[in-house]
Amino acid sequence: MEGLDGTGKTGLVRRIVSDLKSQGFEVVRVRVPTDRIRRSWMFQQVHNLNIQSDVDPLAYEVAYMADRLQLSGAVIKPALDQGKIVVADRYLISSIGSLLVRVPELLDVIETSYTSSGWFNELVSNLVQPDVSFFLHSDADVAMTRIAKKKDERAFDLDANFYRHVFNLGKSFAVANEMVLLDTTNVTAVNINATAQEYISKILRWSHADT
């Protein structure tokens, strides 16, 4: 489940996990960045202290990729091998979703990494590939209003035009990788969940047919 802050992504993940468990499936929920990197010095500097000058943008993106690789190999793959379903709150394009809206200085590094860097694409090929990926998006003003209402969200300056630029970057990558686009601007959480569940049900039917 990919998407920028303010699109309802985490809430949708919770509903999907709950629905799958109610159907009797064993479900593992993961999120990117993981708690491991959230406790790191770099993450604390950028997200909690709002200090970007001491953090090299490329080093930060490499750390994010290492976090994804560790999660993929040590958590996701073993869970799938055990027949469990894994639902990820951000995964492949987590940098676009969680970093750029807070740290615009990372734009050049992340944009280059996602569009033309051989090292990035080579590392991505080592990640467990999702059976289905969703990219949630919303009108910038609506998303920023949602962000402002989150009690646990550290205040940070968010420019609507920059948010739109980041969204367009994420959307282009999502389209190129055949992700399912879900617009959450004027749609209820119940309806968004129902749409997502249609795709998930198809995947589960295909998986059952293969076995």
Give residue ranges: language-model regions.
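Walker A/P-loop
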Residues: T10
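Anion (oxyanion) recognition and catalysis
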Residues: K21, L80-D81, V175
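ATP-binding Walker
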Residues: G6-T7
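A glycine- and Lys/Arg-enriched "phosphate-lid" helix/loop adjacent to the NTP-binding pocket
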Residues: S94-N168
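Hydrophobic/aromatic beta-strand patches that form the interior of the parallel beta-sheet core
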Residues: V28-V30, V87, V132-F134, V180-L182
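ATP-dependent small-molecule kinase phosphotransfer cores
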Residues: F25-T115
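NTP-dependent small-molecule kinase module
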Residues: R15-V17, D141-T211
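Hydrophobic anchor at the beta1->P-loop junction of P-loop NTPases
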Residues: M1
